[in-house]
Curated annotation (Swiss-Prot):
Heme-binding protein which promotes neuronal but not astrocyte differentiation. Residues 35-134 form the Cytochrome b5 heme-binding domain. Residues 231-241 have a biased composition (Basic and acidic residues). The keyword Zinc does not apply. It is found in: Secreted. It comes from the Eukaryota. GO terms for biological process: neuron differentiation; positive regulation of neuron differentiation. Residues 220-249 are annotated as: Disordered. Belongs to the cytochrome b5 family. MAPR subfamily. The gene is Cyb5d2. This is Neuferricin. Keywords: Neurogenesis, Secreted, Signal.
Length: 263
């Protein structure tokens, strides 16, 4: 019962996180009266140099005063290229050239967009929000453009994917592994393997995921009902061993918690 409740708590927290983030997105990107709007040429004056009015940068169209982190963004500093502009793409690509320091995020994946959103959370927490940048993400009236609406949808999609990944990790925690030139490789399961604390150990199995080139080792519960049939009283008491996406390791006993493969 503790195991089932624990998984339920994890999933409930994940769902709650998505709901809370939806509220944050509305607050960040929705209408806000009296907000300051910057034109690109105006923001370009805020590079932190002598005589400049300040040190600002923009991310996904939101402008932040980064004066408190001046040593990172002032002229000559490592991240000086971000100052006075929206260089959203470079937060993901790491391309700090003039060609890379742009706000064009076309072609980025949902996970990369989610990384941008995580950066946005960082700036929201550590720096002062001062306005919005008119252009790719905000219109002249300060409201989101269709491109920013697409970003919001991708953030939601990325969060849902993370939620699914967390659910999968609770069901099939990654194995512990080690390799040495003297002993070869070893895979094993414990109650903490994969960073997932639980009341069962499990046995190593290959898990094949759709689209993945290679399987990876996961720990599989060997008793009780399948994870997707917790309320079925007529289960075979094999845990998740009968999952069709799993395969035993050749040369390893089916119920061994450790599989060793000498050289």
């Amino acid at each position: 019962m503790l195991r089932i409740c624990g998984l339920g708590v994890v999933l409930s927290l994940a769902v709650a996180a998505v709901a809370v983030m939806a509220v944050w997105l509305m607050d960040w990107w929705g209408p806000r009266p009296g907000i300051r709007l910057f034109l690109p040429e105006e923001l370009a004056r805020y590079r932190g140099g002598p005589g400049d009015p300040g040190l600002y940068l923009a991310l996904l169209g939101r402008v932040y005063d980064v004066s408190s982190g001046r040593r990172h963004y002032e002229p000559g500093a490592h991240y000086s290229g971000f100052a006075g502009r929206d260089a959203s793409r470079a937060f993901v690509t790491g391309d700090y050239s003039e060609a890379g320091l742009v706000d064009d995020i076309n072609g980025l994946s949902s996970s990369e967009i989610l990384t941008l959103h995580n950066w946005l959370s960082f700036y929201e927490k550590n720096y002062v929000f001062v306005g919005r940048l008119v252009g790719r993400f905000y219109r002249k009236d300060g409201l989101p453009t269709s491109e920013l609406t697409q970003v919001e949808a991708m953030v939601t999609k990325g969060m849902e994917a993370n939620e699914q990944e967390q659910r999968e990790k609770q069901k099939f925690p990654p194995c512990n592994s080690e390799w040495s030139s003297a002993k070869g490789s070893r895979l094993w399961c414990s109650q903490k393997s994969g960073g997932v604390h639980r009341d069962w150990i499990g046995v190593p199995r290959k898990l094949y995921k759709p689209g993945a080139k290679e399987p990876h080792c996961v720990c599989v519960r060997t008793t009780g009902p399948p994870s997707d049939q917790q309320d079925n009283p007529r289960h075979s008491n094999h845990g998740d061993l009968d999952n069709p996406n799993l395969e035993e390791y050749t040369g390893c006993p089916p119920l061994a918690t450790t599989c060793s493969f000498p050289l």
